Design a protein with these regions (language model features):
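Alpha-helical scaffolding within the catalytic cores
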Residues: 58-62, 79-87, 107-114, 182-187, ...
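Hydrophobic h-region of N-terminal signal peptides that target proteins for export
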Residues: 10-18
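Bacterial N-terminal signal peptides that target proteins for export
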Residues: 1-7
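Hydrophobic faces of well-ordered beta-strands that scaffold small-molecule active sites
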Residues: 25-29, 74-76, 95-100, 125-128, ...
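Catalytic pocket-lining loop regions of alpha/beta-barrel enzymes
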Residues: 124-125, 139-230
Length: 230
């Protein structure tokens, strides 16, 4: 019996070693300050699991997960202050700096400040951009000045697709409409900016994964992440 166990362990060693060495790039992480922590997400998830108690605990738990699962890079988006806080704690140079925006004027943003933040390397990915929650789409005119800047500096764009949290329209995102989260609604952007790299967050969500796949097969500059697909 013991001999069989030893042989089994020996046979599994190469597999276990390979798994432990797998390097992961997480394309979809959110940062918070205490002022916006818990403003959108419920205290417990669908399965009853409780989240972090506050923004500081969330940061520590996420960095522990980075280490545990060998996440070597992570695209982190949130308000600019929160991303800076995460950078200050990032001794392993894991964080790729993003910015979470529902509307083009969030945080008092304008194109002058946005371009300067890119020049200062405070924004390395434009996203998560989530027009859906603000009642717009990435193809709307209000987003075009930002997209032109991103194409100019080769800044990837991460755009929300698929729906949001159940009941969100009745609470924190009254302008959100499910139809606005269809990946097909960004096709005009893909045509207008052929050099602009974009990835579809949530891969079209639970409603439009086929639309995401079809777009990616047609437009070579389009990618996806696979975060929270259901």
């Amino acid at each position: 019996m013991n001999k069989s166990i030893i042989i089994s362990v020996i046979l599994l060693l190469p597999f276990l070693f390979a798994q432990s060495q797998t390097k992961i790039i997480d394309m979809h992480i959110h940062s918070y300050t205490q002022s916006d922590f818990g403003g959108r997400e419920p205290a417990r998830d669908h399965y009853g699991n409780r989240g972090s108690a506050n923004a500081a605990a969330h940061l520590l738990a996420t960095f522990a997960a980075f280490k545990k699962w060998n996440i070597v890079k992570a695209v982190v988006s949130g308000n600019p202050e929160s991303v800076e806080n995460w950078m200050a704690k990032d001794s392993s140079n894991r964080v790729i700096k993003g910015i979470l925006m529902f509307s083009p004027d969030d945080y008092g943003m304008d194109t002058v400040r946005f371009e300067q933040m890119i020049k200062d390397k405070k924004i390395e990915v434009f996203g998560e951009v989530a027009p859906y929650y603000g009642g717009t789409t990435l193809s709307d005119s209000i987003w075009q000045p930002y997209l032109r800047i991103c194409e100019k500096y080769d800044i990837p764009v991460a755009v929300h697709t698929g729906g949001g949290d159940p009941g969100g329209t009745y609470t924190w995102s009254p302008k959100a409409r499910l139809r606005l989260a269809d990946p097909y609604l960004i096709e005009d952007v893909l045509v207008r900016y052929p050099k602009l790299r974009i990835y579809l967050m949530h891969a079209g969500g639970e409603d439009w994964p086929e639309h995401a796949i079809r777009l990616m097969s047609y437009y070579p500059q389009l990618y996806t992440d696979v975060a929270v697909m259901l």
